[in-house]
């Protein structure tokens, strides 16, 4: 599976007047923004993180959204999707009404992703497109938030080339959305509030969940791994874990509300709890507590092999509502490339980890992420990635061609692998990925699987669609009233990436055993 397949599941430059001196934008960054710095970021400490449990919207903002609508377009990962749920919750507490028609919105937010240059280009293109709506409705507020906002080069570009944008804010101050909106309504200049501070943990933020079947729950924020290709440690800040009692309470509330599946989110969930100074409590402890809650399925993303410990494996082996699917990004099968990437593990370490997981959970499905064409990658090193994929027997993968991200150490490396070589390697890798995915799904032909029905198929309204515990897509015909329920389906046909089945029955509601 390539990036295009992954994303499928989900510029107007203003002329400058020559007779005026160029505006000095540095003032925007003196207090609220610091450019990404690997050296400075690695020095960041723990003492600045504070926990706030008393979030509420001040009375001064009451009625702000009366007779006004909002629209949020989200780019990128599940973390961004969850941030959108929070912002939608804040909007609705302010009295705004959501709309799906962007040109009719009174406030438009682009919640951005900085992981790849292609994602950023889409945002700039959308900003140019929004200008025509702004001209028709000068009262429309346009805002840019999310990871791109944490990059100084991006904010500078918006300030210079997209003056119709009204507000820019970062990932650390979503809770200040009411203040930012108020200032945008009152100000004649673009409101820029991007904190270089690494962020606190804000509890009790309102949320407008995007669905009623599956829910995302943040367990931590940020990342301290500093892989040389990745911008996330700069845009999301240092690792900071939510307190376990807050997470457990949220999951209990979701279970009581009828949710069937919880996805625990973090840039590196396996580092959960490492920053606690008063308790010894890691991801394995959290999963052990959550498995006792009466909710059918719990899964997590994203894992880092370096922090995947034996206790977590031991807990996952207890199964119950802990699913048998682990997404474990390896990125490369070459020790030399892993070292350049600063992944801090070796091929041998990764294979030993996989061996432990498979020994404890024989039915486990493993999926991964892989980058090809990294600086200095040789044909032999790429072949090592192919051999590792076969040795592990991954059942699916998100595959990418390397592209440099400004502000990362890798961007300073010579990108010396020709583009045609990168594309050829990606094609060869995807052939292997497709082969192993097809074989894995073919083994299910004739088997009965448990499916959480999420709705109708994207292609046919008379076909239902859902996912197995191992996150495999299943399409089948059945009664619409089973949407939102767990059902048993017999597999009758397979493709490289999905299954077709025959509806059998609804799964009986069984209490989760402790």
Curated annotation (Swiss-Prot):
Protein name according to UniProt: tRNA-2-methylthio-N(6)-dimethylallyladenosine synthase
Name of encoding gene: miaB
Intracellular or extracellular location(s): Cytoplasm
Biased segments, Basic and acidic residues type: 15-24
Keywords: 4Fe-4S, Cytoplasm, Iron, Iron-sulfur, Metal-binding, S-adenosyl-L-methionine, Transferase, tRNA processing
Domain of life: Bacteria
Domain MTTase N-terminal: 68-186
Organism, as annotated: Lysinibacillus sphaericus (strain C3-41)
A GO cellular component annotation in the UniProt record: cytosol
Domain annotation Radical SAM core: ranges: 209-439
Function: Catalyzes the methylthiolation of N6-(dimethylallyl)adenosine (i(6)A), leading to the formation of 2-methylthio-N6-(dimethylallyl)adenosine (ms(2)i(6)A) at position 37 in tRNAs that read codons beginning with uridine.
Cofactor comment: Binds 2 [4Fe-4S] clusters. One cluster is coordinated with 3 cysteines and an exchangeable S-adenosyl-L-methionine.
Region (Disordered): 1-24
Assembly and oligomerization: Monomer.
Gene3D superfamilies noted in UniProt: Methylthiotransferase, N-terminal domain, tm_1862 like domain
Listed Pfam families: Radical_SAM, TRAM, UPF0004
Domain TRAM: 442-505
A GO MF term: 4 iron, 4 sulfur cluster binding
Family: Belongs to the methylthiotransferase family. MiaB subfamily.
Catalysed reactions, as listed in the record: N(6)-dimethylallyladenosine(37) in tRNA + (sulfur carrier)-SH + AH2 + 2 S-adenosyl-L-methionine = 2-methylsulfanyl-N(6)-dimethylallyladenosine(37) in tRNA + (sulfur carrier)-H + 5'-deoxyadenosine + L-methionine + A + S-adenosyl-L-homocysteine + 2 H(+)
UniProt cofactor(s): [4Fe-4S] cluster
């Amino acid at each position: 599976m390539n990036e295009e397949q992954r994303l499928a599941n989900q510029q107007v430059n203003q002329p400058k007047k020559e007779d005026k001196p160029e505006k000095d934008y540095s003032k925007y960054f003196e207090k609220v923004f610091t450019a990404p710095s690997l050296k400075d970021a690695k020095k960041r400490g723990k003492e600045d993180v504070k926990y706030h449990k008393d979030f509420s919207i001040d009375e001064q903002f009451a009625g702000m959204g009366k007779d006004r609508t909002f629209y949020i377009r989200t780019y990128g990962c599940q973390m961004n999707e969850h941030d959108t749920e929070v912002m939608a919750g804040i909007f609705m507490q302010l009295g705004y009404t959501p709309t799906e028609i962007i040109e009719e919105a009174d406030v438009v937010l682009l919640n951005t992703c900085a992981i790849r240059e292609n994602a950023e280009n889409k945002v700039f293109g959308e900003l140019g497109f929004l200008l025509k709506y702004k001209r028709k409705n000068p009262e429309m507020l346009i805002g840019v938030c999310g990871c791109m906002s944490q990059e100084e080069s991006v904010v500078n570009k918006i300030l210079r080339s997209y003056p119709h944008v009204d507000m820019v804010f970062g990932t650390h101050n979503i809770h200040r959305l009411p203040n930012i909106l108020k200032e945008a309504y009152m100000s004649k200049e673009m409101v820029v509030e991007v904190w270089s501070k690494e962020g606190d943990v804000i509890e009790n933020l309102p949320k407008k969940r995007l669905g009623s079947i599956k829910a995302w729950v943040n367990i931590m924020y940020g990342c301290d791994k500093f892989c040389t290709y990745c911008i996330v440690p700069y845009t999301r800040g240092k690792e900071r874990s939510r307190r376990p009692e807050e997470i457990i309470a949220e999951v209990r509330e979701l279970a009581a509300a009828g949710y069937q599946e919880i996805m625990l989110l973090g840039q590196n969930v396996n580092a959960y709890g490492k920053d606690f100074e008063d308790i010894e409590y890691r991801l394995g402890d959290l999963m052990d507590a959550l498995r006792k809650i009466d909710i059918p399925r719990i899964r997590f993303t994203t894992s880092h092999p370096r922090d995947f410990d034996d206790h977590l494996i031991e807990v996952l082996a207890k199964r119950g509502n802990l699913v048998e699917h682990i997404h474990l990004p390896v990125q490369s099968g070459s020790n030399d490339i892993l070292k350049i990437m600063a992944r801090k593990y070796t091929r041998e370490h990764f294979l030993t980890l996989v061996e432990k997981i498979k020994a404890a959970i024989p039915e486990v499905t493993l999926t991964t992420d892989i980058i090809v064409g990294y600086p200095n990658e040789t044909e032999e090193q790429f072949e090592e990635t192919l051999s590792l994929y076969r040795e592990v027997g991954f059942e699916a993968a998100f595959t990418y061609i390397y592209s440099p991200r400004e502000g990362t150490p890798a961007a300073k490396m010579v990108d010396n692998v020709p583009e045609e070589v990168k594309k050829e390697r990606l094609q060869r890798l995807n052939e292997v990925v497709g082969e192993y995915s097809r074989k894995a799904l073919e083994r299910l032909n004739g088997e009965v699987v448990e499916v959480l029905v999420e709705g109708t198929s994207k292609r046919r309204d008379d076909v239902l669609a859902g996912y197995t515990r191992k996150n495999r897509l299943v399409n089948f015909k059945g009664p619409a009233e089973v949407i939102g329920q767990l059902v048993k389906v017999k597999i009758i046909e397979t493709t490289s990436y999905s299954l077709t089945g025959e509806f059998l029955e609804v799964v009986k509601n069984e209490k989760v055993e402790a």
